[in-house]
Swiss-Prot record:
RNA chaperone that binds small regulatory RNA (sRNAs) and mRNAs to facilitate mRNA translational regulation in response to envelope stress, environmental stress and changes in metabolite concentrations. Also binds with high specificity to tRNAs. The gene is hfq. Keywords: RNA-binding, Stress response. GO terms for biological process: regulation of DNA-templated transcription; regulation of RNA stability; regulation of translation, ncRNA-mediated. Residues 73-82 have a biased composition (Polar residues). It comes from Shewanella pealeana (strain ATCC 700345 / ANG-SQ1). Residues 9-68 form the Sm domain. SUPFAM superfamilies: Sm-like ribonucleoproteins. Disulfide bonds: none annotated. This is RNA-binding protein Hfq. Homohexamer. Pfam families: Hfq (PF17209). The keyword Glycosyltransferase does not apply.
Length: 92
């Protein structure tokens, strides 16, 4: 698994499993809404009245419409590792 996938896979999988409605904002400003039906390394399949294949490189932000659990030990460890690498010691 690539380092960049260690947070997004558990996040997207939890959205898919719990059928959480999401808003996906593209880099060009377009807002798409639906539920994550499936995903892979390059695309997210978003289902609303129709299914849309959205390329990840075109996505700016994924916003869940409600709280959900990302209960994945790997995601927690990845975030802790990221925080440790980016902690410069300056507390504000």
């Amino acid at each position: 698994m690539a380092k960049g996938q260690s947070l997004q896979d558990p996040f997207l999988n939890a959205l898919r499993r719990e059928r959480v409605p999401v808003s996906i904002y593209l880099v060009n400003g377009i807002k798409l809404q639906g539920q994550v039906e499936s995903f892979d390394q390059f695309v997210i399949l978003l289902k609303n009245t129709v299914s849309q294949m959205v390329y990840k490189h075109a996505i700016s932000t994924v916003v869940p419409s409600r709280p959900f659990n990302v209960s994945n030990h790997q995601a927690t460890n990845a975030q802790a590792g990221y925080n440790a690498q980016h902690d410069d010691g300056d507390e504000k």
